[in-house]
Amino acid sequence: VGDKILKHHLVADKTPGTEDITTTAWSGDRGLTLIEMGPFGVIGAITPCTNPSETILCNTMGMLAGGNTVVFNPHPAAIKTSIYAINLLNEASLESGGPDNIAVTVEKPTLETSNVMMKHKDIPLIAATGGPGVVTAVLSSGKRGIGAGAGNPPALVDETADIRKAATDIVNGCTFDNNLPCIAEKEIVAVSSIVDELMHYLVAEN
């Protein structure tokens, strides 16, 4: 439970917002060039069952900062948690003087509702967090897509590392929230000269 609470605090504190959306301008002999960001409009988002509320909160905050709204197609196994998170976001928007329905969801998400969303003429951008199948579907949908697929992050350890600290950090990372997050360490690649020492400290970390 503590790890899940920490994940929500990290989302609240670290999700980029409007401060990351800047206007860039430069001038030269041929005139002035101005680059200014603009919203896509309504973004379609597919979310996983492993981090349902965290993904919905992070997606919505970033998308809203860019002037967008979002319609979610959550993983069916996480629909209750997803609806709860979406309701909290809309309540927060209203309490802050913002609009209602900044984020919405289908009540009974399926592969069919996901396909409808990906083909909808008023949704120009699809964001997907999940396994390789859903990410591949989004990136081959013919629309602009952002895909965050399954991860298998390696921890690389060589002779320049603080071996004891490396062991501690690897164990802390791979046991965080039962290793559910795709960003958590899943494997170790170590140079042969420090393998025995690294194994010693890994065992000491239990």
Task: Go through the PLM ranges and name each one.
Residues T23-K165:
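Rossmann-like NAD(P) dinucleotide-binding subdomain of oxidoreductase/dehydrogenase enzymes
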Residues H8-H9, E107, K121, I170:
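A general structural motif at alpha-helix termini
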Residues A65, V135-N206:
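ALDH superfamily catalytic-core signature
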Residues H8-H9, H75, H120, H200:
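Histidine (H) residue identity feature
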Residues V1-L32:
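N-terminal Rossmann-like NAD(P)+-binding subdomain of aldehyde/semialdehyde dehydrogenases
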